[in-house]
């Protein structure tokens, strides 16, 4: 797995633009982890919200921006705690927030990992799966 992660990092680092790097990241993580969904939410500290910047497996509505406030949802909780959250059934968690536009209602398993560089939260990476399971 470490070899695969290094390969992903190298591909992401060689992408010429951020959106291409993020699309490589979510696609390759889905394949490496054998999961249906991987998404990246980037933090905007001025507006105190996360923007869904890239996803594989969720619906990203055209012409609409998907945002979560820093205090919303499990993504917000991952950011506030600055540590991973691994849930077999995210929908039962008190911080779960349903976002109808991304069509995530069938996904139960959730792993959210903060993206941190030099002690600054840059965003949250999320993987999801329909089956009830905890990621290992």
Region annotations inferred by a language model:
Residues 1-20, 31, 122:
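Signal-transmission linkers at sensory-effector interfaces
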Residues 51-53, 60-98:
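Regulatory sensory and allosteric helical modules in signal-transduction proteins
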Residues 108-116:
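A short, aliphatic-rich beta-strand micro-motif
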Residues 62, 128-136:
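Regulatory loop-to-helix N-cap segments in sensory/regulatory domains
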């Amino acid at each position: 797995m470490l070899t695969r992660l290094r390969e992903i990092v190298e591909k992401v680092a060689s992408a010429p633009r951020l959106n291409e790097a993020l699309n490589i990241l979510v696609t390759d993580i889905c394949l490496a982890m054998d999961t249906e969904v991987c998404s990246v939410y980037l933090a905007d500290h001025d507006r105190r919200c996360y923007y869904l910047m890239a996803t594989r497996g969720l619906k990203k509505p055209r012409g609409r921006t998907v945002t979560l406030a820093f205090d919303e949802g499990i993504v917000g909780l991952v950011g506030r705690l600055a540590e991973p959250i691994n849930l077999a059934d995210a929908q039962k968690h008190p911080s779960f927030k349903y976002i109808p536009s991304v069509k995530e209602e069938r996904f139960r398993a959730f792993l959210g990992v903060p993206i941190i560089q030099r002690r600054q939260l840059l965003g949250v990476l999320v993987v999801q799966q329909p089956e009830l399971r905890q990621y290992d």
